[in-house]
Amino acid sequence: MSFIFHPLAVVCFSGAILVYKDELNSLLAPNVVNVNLNKENLSKRISFDEQREIIASELDGYEMVGINIDANPKKCDKIWLIEHNDSQKEWKFIYFDAFSGKIKSEPLAHDEGFFGVLTELHESLFLGKSGHVILTLTAIFTFFICISGFVIYRKFWLTLLRLRVNRLNVFMSDIHKMIGIFSTPILLLICISGFWWKFQMARMPEFKNDFVIDAKIYNKSLSLDELVARSKNDLAGFEPHFISLPFMQGANIRLFGYVKDQNFLHNEYSSILTYDKIAAN
């Protein structure tokens, strides 16, 4: 069973750290991830169009392909970039203070740095496609192990809290059943959600490198601020948290966000509005 346990342990441990990525970043690099608020700029967040102009001016070798607006207004925006004419289309990011208009970090590849490496470990065990296959099989086998446990111990509630200590074998059997019963719902959620993400990644269209990333990638005369304002009219209560700009063939401008009073199962990126990259239709 070690071929299931080891990948599962790595995924659970790395995922537990990644959950607190923002909090750890705030502790390790507060001057980079936090905005510089003062009385003068307290309520003067610069516009998205200004952000685009600043990035184009100071990082003219890159194309901005995404703006991540943190739900916490005290956090910097995370700007995603692709270098012009980069054949690999590698995504990089910077932290941008939307109140002072300052770039807080150098472009960093998405899989660099501690959390980048940890994310790669969590997603593929550093094994690329083979890692995705291993983790998919791990999720499937763990799911069936959890279900088989419920089948074997159908009346588990009768001995749920029984823990006999008179003999080692009996004690280990009882502790195994107790831990298994309490951990099974969590393991099932991990397996199902993990398998769902792997399925979503597998069905994504193939990324074609022949798409040229340059300044003419979309209609730059379109106002991002007008699109954001329009999105709030198109979908009542909509609050955008990620602006996705074209980065591959056929891609348009998409706004990811949430709707106020939405179901608690949704996150801040659950609702998506798409606009044409040329005419914003």
PLM region spans:
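Conserved histidines in hydrophobic membrane contexts and catalytic metal-binding motifs
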Residues: 1-281
